[in-house]
Amino acid sequence: MTTDLHRVMHGVAIRKHGDARAIAGLAGLAVAKVENVLRGALAAGRVLEVDGKYMLTPCGQMMLAGEYSRFNDGLRADADFSAAYQRFEVINKDLKQLITDWQTIDVGGKRVANNHADRDYDQRVIGRLGDLHERFEPILSKLCGAEPRLGIYRDKLGAALDKAEDGALAWVSDAKLDSYHTVWFELHEDLLRILGHAREE
């Protein structure tokens, strides 16, 4: 079983420059509990705090890296969890292409930045995002079944998709929001850390 400190440190690693509330959501802990743990981690030199936002120190990174195998050995040995992760990686490639298609558009045979003036084009991409989400839901259910904490991503992805489908285009990929792409990226980072894999660029 993980400690509160590990869960908070893991949350800081996932939500870089996040505040206590954002970290609490990822850690699955109450905000007050996270604030208390962060104070201790700050005093121990494991995190840095700037204007209420936190990040790991080199010491904190080393401590966290050393704990992952100990706390996640069960998940790493779980064949169903690993299989679900591999299916996630297949869909991850599709999402990367979808986000490229969202952020750029073909004009005269050249890809240029999408200014989102073509509403029909945007709606087609959002429709594809909805289809991708439907394909991903059973995979995410498998992941959450093994690690219930991951349920926060199911809630956030669903909320972002709903907003995008309702016309709030920023919720597709805006890095300043818990957009679909932002939350997906954090889920990917979470899974990589759980399993001890490196991100492929």
Regions found by a protein language model. Give the residues of each.
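Short amphipathic alpha-helical interface segments
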Residues: T2-L29
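Short, amphipathic alpha-helical interaction segments positioned at domain boundaries
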Residues: Q61-R87
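Intrinsically disordered, low-complexity terminal tails/loops enriched in metal-binding residues
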Residues: K16-D19, A83, Q103-T104, W171, ...
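Exposed, interaction-prone assembly regions rather than primary DNA-binding/catalytic cores
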Residues: A79-E165, L169
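A short, conserved structural fragment
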Residues: L42-G52
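Short amphipathic alpha-helical interaction segments
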Residues: A27-A43
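C-terminal regulatory/effector modules of DNA-binding transcriptional regulators
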Residues: I152-E201
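Accessory beta->alpha helical hairpin/"wing" motif in late/C-terminal subdomains of nucleic-acid enzymes
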Residues: D51-L64
